[in-house]
Regions:
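N-terminal Rossmann-like NAD(P) cofactor-binding subdomain of oxidoreductases
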Residues: 1-158
Length: 158
């Protein structure tokens, strides 16, 4: 689902792309999808499919990202991890653009640098809430318990 959402957001924001490739695991290989108005086949993640790719977005499950991200790095692609698989890897930059904006932080953009892992939406929402509450009064302690939706653990119907 994340891949489809990513594709829609990139299209809505007019992400400047000359060649968009849809790569996925074995389960999706050969399926036809569209990028813009053009039909395209979903291909496997192989080094030759990553040649001359400026940005690689990982929106798959964590295990698949862990098993394939080095191919993108070796191909010289900038990596944006939306699967949260790389957040504990050495040298990976954890980013939360909404939080950065709320704090007035303008981070330097280093293309060709470390992979970027985007903070989990639940963490971003909690951080925004706490930052805004802190503007009203000081916070001495905050305890948050976030449970993963059961639907994330259940096998897909089929």
């Amino acid at each position: 689902m994340k891949g489809r959402e990513l594709k829609e957001v990139l299209a809505e924001r007019n992400f400047p792309a000359r060649d968009t490739r849809l790569l996925d695991d074995e389960e999706s290989l050969g399926q036809v999808d569209t990028v813009g108005d053009e039909p395209t086949f979903i291909q496997s993640v192989l080094p030759e499919h990553l040649e001359n790719v400026d940005f690689t977005f990982f929106a798959s499950d964590e295990t698949y990202t862990r098993n394939t991200w080095q191919m993108a790095r070796n191909a010289g692609s900038d990596i944006i991890d939306l699967s949260y698989a790389l957040e504990r890897e050495p040298g990976v930059s954890l980013r939360a653009p909404w939080i950065e904006r709320e704090l007035g932080i303008t981070p330097a953009i280093d293309f060709g640098g470390a992979p970027v892992c985007v903070a989990h939406p639940a963490a971003v929402v909690m951080a925004l809430l706490l930052l805004r509450l802190q503007k009203v009064d000081s916070i001495s302690r905050a305890v948050v318990t976030i449970l993963e939706p059961a639907s994330e653990q259940m096998p897909a119907p089929g």
